[in-house]
Regions:
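Residues at the starts of beta-strands that form the adenosine-phosphate
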Residues: 32-33, 97
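Short Gly/Pro-enriched turn/cap motifs at secondary-structure boundaries
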Residues: 77-78, 134-137, 167-170
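A glycosyltransferase accessory/donor-loop signature
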Residues: 1-9, 16-19, 142, 147-235
Length: 235
């Protein structure tokens, strides 16, 4: 099974995206990392003249047609790129599965086990978080999501998810759509795979640390420290 990771973001997230991806590459063997961005290539002022590691490829999503600019979530607090994961089955038609990782995640150990995990006929594997009031069912955080793209394409459920985010306000963007349409077919994984203190059970030895929501200021400091550390991956 190919190990494919995907990060997405607008230009203001490029710096975090590069650091997040290099934390993954430092610990884990992968076959491909995709950056879904707003440019044809990653800016040299961020990655330096040496460019990105060879395993990383960029897709320019500025001309995407899945999400309408007059839709209720396109210009929300988060950028339209946060809607892209519901279209991954079509963005990556050649892939059987991908691991979606938010730009504000740092991989701290080898996550090969997550890449190779048996999804047991579920659409995704995700970490559960406390139920939000508007949802009368188990709610999962999408910041780390292993997706069975073949299953999505077979059922076409992602098309309903795309229609949902184009037609109604989703405060958590694609995350709401995953929880509505994949409910009952989400494999629950432990908090060590997506450790964000305000949304998941605390774990002292996480594989992936997620600086989400209220942890953003601390996350920005952590990313700067990571970038400056002697063991940061260099090409």
């Amino acid at each position: 099974m190919r190990r494919v990771a995907v990060y997405m973001g607008t230009r203001n997230y490029y710096g975090m995206m590069e650091i997040a991806a290099k934390s993954l590459l430092r610990h884990t063997r992968v076959d491909r990392v995709w950056f879904l961005i707003e440019d044809d290539k990653f800016p040299e002022e961020i990655c330096g003249p040496q460019g990105l590691p060879d395993v990383i490829r960029c897709k320019n999503m500025s001309g995407q047609t899945w999400f309408t600019q007059d839709g209720p979530n396109y210009n929300a607090h988060w950028t339209y790129t946060c809607l892209l994961p519901v279209a991954y089955p079509e963005i990556f038609p050649e892939e059987k599965r991908v691991l979606r990782l938010d730009d504000d995640t740092i991989v701290e150990k080898d996550i090969g086990e997550l890449f190779d995990m048996d999804l047991e006929d579920n659409y995704t594997a995700m970490v559960e978080e406390p139920v939000r009031g508007k949802f009368p069912f188990r709610y999962f955080n999408a910041g780390v999501t292993l997706m069975d793209l073949e299953k999505f394409r077979q059922t076409g459920i992602h098309r309903k998810m795309i229609r949902m985010v184009n037609s109604m306000v989703c405060t958590a963007m694609d995350q709401d759509a995953f929880n509505v349409y994949c409910q009952g077919q989400i494999k629950k994984i432990g908090p060590e795979w997506n450790m964000a203190e305000h949304i998941t059970e605390h774990h002292n030895d996480p594989y992936i640390r997620h600086y989400a929501g209220c942890l953003k200021p601390r996350g920005e400091r952590a990313f700067r420290e990571y970038e400056q550390a002697e063991w940061r991956v260099k090409e």
